[in-house]
Amino acid sequence: MSFDQFVGTKPVEERHRFDTARLDQFMRSNVEGYSGTLEVAMFKGGQSNPTYKLTAGGQAGGKNYVLRKKPPGKLLPSAHAVDREFRVIKALHGVGFPVPRPYALCEDDGVIGTMFYIMDCVEGRVLWDQAMPDMTKSQRFAIWDELNRVIAQLHTIDYKAVGLETFGKPGSYLERQIGRWTKQYQASETQKIEAMDNLIAWLPKNIPAGDETTVVHGDFRLDNTIFHPTEPRILAVLDWELSTLGHPLADFSYHCMSWHIPAGKFRGIEGMPFEELGIPTEQQYIDLYCKRTGRAAIDPSTWDFNMAYNLFRIAGITQGIAKRVVDGTASSAHALEAGSKAPLLAELGWLQVEKILRRGTGERAPSR
């Protein structure tokens, strides 16, 4: 699969254009150090919040910024919360976690049509292909190890100390999220997916015991990070739209979904020759995370539940993308392809439930 379609910028599509003069005026008043003639382009990657590259051409050498905004049109409740993105980025930047420098949040729809925020444009590598075909074995391992280090760092930050104690509701995260994504999925439903119906019925009744609360990213994956141009070092973690206070295992298992999705399907690496490529096995990756966070070994059924939940959640997210294509509000020409993955992801989620049932550690499955 070629990832060229996602890389770089493109001219701003008609439905995503806005008044650059009003934006320029806002930036002069709210963005420290900004001056010059503003040029605007749109990033190709992503299907969620429209993201723009802003270039202040009049400054010495030019200065680049990134603008993230809500998409136009009718939106699902609580979706596209760019104000929450800005809040968590600002808090984490203050304690040295790798995020772009935040500049300003604008909640006035009258400036460019929707709420938006502006942050620094971090220059580096965005790696889209988890196979990393142009890297050596040791280089691949170093990239995966850095991803592991950074998500472990996130989950060990004291959310109260960084002012995020009201960023979400502590406790009962999985229960609330299953309810939320059930509602979001049902609001976006365009076809019947039997595996999703089964997950909706089974998951709330089988939540594992034990609860923890940390800052969670919600979409931590390779292509939501920017690596140093030459070093295996993350300079910035991007796309905090789904961030909240939640259970770290739910967040980490989401990050590990790739080991459960066949290679070539939706960022999957299942079936790849891990040792040959220098990619850690899932268990090796879990062990690294546990060591870095001071966590004991994770119960297999607890892990499988979290994996089932996350495959259910991402199926719901992709179904939301499919619905936005139908409604005409999707912000990417490739959103239709992403939205079509919902049935596959739901089936993979149900496979995790079947593993739990074979161990005899979950309630009987609904009739299929």
Question: PLM features: what roles do these ranges have?
Answer:
Residues S2-Y34:
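Juxta-kinase regulatory segment immediately upstream of eukaryotic protein kinase catalytic domains
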Residues H93, H155-Y159, L238, C256, ...:
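Protein kinase-like catalytic domain
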Residues G168-K169, A297-Y309:
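All-alpha amphipathic helical-bundle segments outside canonical DNA-binding/catalytic cores
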Residues A250-R295, Y309-D327:
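Active-site activation/catalytic loop segments of kinase-like enzymes and analogous catalytic loops
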Residues A296-P300, R313-R368:
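Helical subdomain adjoining the active site within ATP-dependent kinase catalytic cores
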